[in-house]
Amino acid sequence: MEEGELKIIVERIQDPDIDIQNNALNMLFDVTKSSHSKSIDTINFQYLADNLDVLEDVCKRLEGNKKRWLCDIISAICVVDDERKLLAYRVEGNIIDLKEWGHLYVKKLIGCIADVKNNKMDFPFAKTRDVGRECIDFLFKHNAEFEAIDFLVEVGGIETVLDYVDTHNYNRIVLYLEDMNSFVDLEEVILKIYLKMGDHSRYVVGLIRRQKSKEAIEYVRSIEDRDYKKQCLYILARCNLYYEASDPEEKYILSNGYIKDVYREIGAELEIDKPSKMDAILKGFKYDKDTRQLASIGIANGFVHMGYGRDPIFLPQEGDSRVPLDYEAILGCDVPDLISVFGSIGVIESWNSEKVMETLQEHIFADFSYRKTGSLLGLALSGLRNFEERPAILALLSNNLQSSSSIHVIATLLGIEAMFSGTQAEEVRELLQPLMFSDSSEVVFFTSFTLGSVFCGSADEDLTSLMLQTFVEKGKESETQFFRFLMLGLASLFYRRKDVECGIMEIGGALSKHESILIKGFQYVGTGDSNVIESILTDSFTGDTDALLESLGLLSCALVSMGDETSSQMVGRIVSSSLLLDSSHLRSVLPLCYSILYPSNPQVNVLDMLEKSLNIGETNCIISTIVSLGLIGAGTLNSRITKILDQQYSYYYKDSKVLPVLKIAQGLVSLGKGLLSISPLYFDKTTFMPKNTIGLFSTVFMLLDSSISPLVSSHAYMFFLLCQACTQKYVTCSEKINIRVGHPINTVGMVGEPKKLSSVQTHTSPVVLSEKIRAETDENVCSSYIEDVLILKKN
């Protein structure tokens, strides 16, 4: 429009004739609207902005809707110039529909309201509420949910999003809020959205993620739809949550009785149920006279055949290939290695404690011996997730705690820890608390770890006080390896409890600073909080060099970064950069950090780094690197890791410390023949399982000084800590369905319904998923998470 025409419109607005004035206002509206529709017509806006004082004078003389109409027009004109007037006139007018001005104007308007909220603009915030509500309406109606959510978070009104969620935008909104939840606590709003939309699986998982286990159980009990309830029961069972149910089917699912049947059916369907040959693990083993390798071979064999109920050594079936091992001769020698051997039988029969009881009955009810202790450990490991059998198994284990030998008591405690980790079972407290006053320091320290693991995340005051007292009284033994179990137990109590302070620094004593750093790592597990990482590194690397403190600092940073891709990469670079300090303890801790960051998730650059670590020549570094290769490759059958480990045999076949861990690492790579993982993250990698996290971290933590670690020197059976970290990585369904698998695409903030997977392949269930792969299906299943066991919703 020509400048002259604009001039006439401005003049006519001042005309006393009402009709002329109305026409001029309508023309001004049309000009302003057309300028907005062209993004911004600078010529029109510039002229109108220069004559804004004239329009403002006219506005003062007008009344009623005409005045409000002109206020809105003036507000729209101010979009290129005066933000305060833009907001003030819109608040005064607020009569013209926002869609007339378009998205750019609304975006500018919400920016002004946010500035008012943050005291960057002098204007009463209360007066902006109606305008803000209209802006939110506009944004949600025009598929700009993400800008609306950003605005609501900025002004502290995120609860309003509940009014706008529907089936059309639900997935986009939830995905965006879940991603934003890493920076702002939006969990309560997200849970309310799940509840509103009737998304049972996400709601239950959300409660579990918030450590609201009781609410999750009560909600599942209240679900009336049979199929959805059944699906949520599988979720509870997977997260080790149990309640007494009268329905036999509910009881069967909740007690994890289904795992054995489903797991073995999938193994048979994939034709991997027959025993593996294990040539690499048995290489160089002399069956007739070599008993020193029994423990490591038993553990490795247990990991490979975990859950299948058959193997080539102890439990072969008719027609299976067998290892020519004299089983009777093994039973004849009562040596500590038998704890690992019999424990491995329980691992092979995982989720089938009845069979273990039948197989090892004569040893379980015998007098104190390594055979009995190993059999009890095996029984506990077989009942790791079976809630029905726990009371009976605990009763059998409790008798063995009366032994005068610490190795028997510790192995029994390991079985109790594996079964009850994360359950906060009071019967375990009553049973174990007297052992905190045992004459054996090793028993005291391992009891602390067991209690910490059982009550992880509870911040229990009585246990905290008891462990702090032990921490001070046993300070003289802080240099021993078993003292670290006390440190682990105390830290476990504060798992993901940022709201509680331990007070370890106030009591002082040896390793109090070390413990405070470990506790901070546990408090912020998986948050990826860069400020916490910076704080830990500052505390660890300031002052004189302290090998344990620096190692703990890096491990705690890895713990904080678990599950967060960006943070994991950052900490990975920090850890690799620490090698520039040229310290042997940092060279040893590097592979351990990687095994926390990438469990069952081999990365090419990480394997390159670990392969170089094997050439350093320091025993500590070699052992921690070999175990880390096993942890990173656990259950992946990764050919490169297998090749690297095979190559090490020719160097270390005579090394009594390296060879056992080499065999165990080889067993880990073939964990469950590829059906199992040790990743502690469930449900699209959003939810940490405390039991799995503690099982993984405690194994890694106890390898800090690996050449003198109990796991390497005298207590090899402690590698069974990893059993509680094992989880099935298959997807199966109550009926055969098509499942698409592929690499996940980050669709956060994308409009419409973009594809969520790339490199897609379609398979019929069951399907095995690696760490980098996700699944989806078009079938009407009862879960939003395509993992584990799915229930097909019947029409």
Swiss-Prot record:
InterPro entries of this UniProt entry? ARM-like, ARM-type_fold, Proteasome/cyclosome_rpt, RPN1_C, RPN1_N
Which Pfam families does this chain map to?
Answer: PC_rep, RPN1_C, RPN1_RPN2_N
Q: Which UniProt keywords apply?
A: Cytoplasm, Nucleus, Proteasome, Repeat
**Which biological process terms from the Gene Ontology are attached to this UniProt entry?**
proteasome-mediated ubiquitin-dependent protein catabolic process
What cellular-component terms does GO give this entry?
A: nucleus; proteasome regulatory particle, base subcomplex; proteasome storage granule
Subunit and interaction comment: The 26S proteasome consists of a 20S proteasome core and two 19S regulatory subunits. The 20S proteasome core is composed of 28 subunits that are arranged in four stacked rings, resulting in a barrel-shaped structure. The two end rings are each formed by seven alpha subunits, and the two central rings are each formed by seven beta subunits. The catalytic chamber with the active sites is on the inside of the barrel.
Task: Return the similarity comment.
Answer: Belongs to the proteasome subunit S2 family.
Which function does this protein serve?
A: Acts as a regulatory subunit of the 26S proteasome which degrades poly-ubiquitinated proteins in the cytoplasm and in the nucleus. It is essential for the regulated turnover of proteins and for the removal of misfolded proteins. The proteasome is a multicatalytic proteinase complex that is characterized by its ability to cleave peptides with Arg, Phe, Tyr, Leu, and Glu adjacent to the leaving group at neutral or slightly basic pH.
Put simply, this protein is called: 26S proteasome regulatory subunit RPN1
